[in-house]
Amino acid sequence: MKRVFTSIAIMATMLFASAQNQLFFKHMFEKKTSDESIVGLGYRDDWGFYKSEDGRFILIDMAILSAVEPSAGIICCNITFKGEGCKNEEEAKTILESKVKPAIESLANDKKNKSAYVAASMDSTKLEIFAYTYNTEELKKEIEKSKLVGKIGQNMNISFKNDKNWNIYQTKLFPDQWNYQKIQNQRIIEDLQAKGDVNTKLHIVSHFISFPLDKRENADNLAAKAKTWKYYVDQVEEEEGVVKVVFSKKSKTDLESITTVTNEVMNLAKEFGGEYVEWSTRVMRD
C-alpha cells in the first residue's frame, strides 16, 4: 500500500460569514475595488455548490467579498426564471455548473457595465441569478441582449435593490460555516481521488485548531478533551502567532463520514473558543 501525503488548508476565518452576518472584508489583494469596477486587479474567483437550509441549491463565488469594500453605489441585481426548477440536488448541480455558470461567465467578461455575477440558485420552481453592479441600465441592456433567455429558460424577470453592505449576498446566498466546511470537504475528497485514493479505507485524519496566544489554557483544555474522545494529540504549541493544536484519529473519508467528523471537531473547537482551520490526511492506494 503506497501513501502520498496531501493537505488542503481551509481558511475558515477568511472565507465564511460570521453567525452575526458581519462584513469580513479582507485585504488579500493589492488593489481593492473602486467605483470603477467590482473587483480589483489580482481577483480570483472561487465557486462552490451547496444545499441551503431552506432547500435551495446554490452555486456561489465565495471569494468576491475578499476583494471588495462597502459602497453606497452598489446594487444587487436579481434575474429570475420562473418555471425553471429542478428535481433534485444532482440535477441542480449539473444545470448550475455546466449550463448557468458558463453563460454568466461569458457576460462577466464585459467590464463596461461595472458588474460582477456572484451566484445562481435553484429550487423546485425557479432559477435565480444574482449580480452586483454600479450601472443598472447597462447591466439590464446586456442581460436582455444576451442569450440567457433560451439558453437558461423563459419568463425572465429582472429586479434591482440597493445593497451597500452586500447583505443579500451574505444572508441569503453565502453558506453558513457548516455548509462552507462541507464544500471544502468535498474538494479535499476530489483532490484525494484524483491522486488515486481509495476512500473505503480508514485514513488517519489530522485536525488543526488555532487559538490566540492569550488562550493557551483553552488550547490545553481542548487537547485534554480530545484525548477523552479517543483522539491522539500530535501538537499543542505556539507557532506563527497562534497556539496550534493538532490531533488525529482514524476516520472514513467519504463526504458523509468526514462531514460528521468535521462538524464534531468544529463544535469541540467552539466549546473552548478555538477556530477550526483544516484537516489533512494521506492518499491511500491499493
Where are these regions (language model features)?
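Long, contiguous binding/interaction regions
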Residues: N21-D286
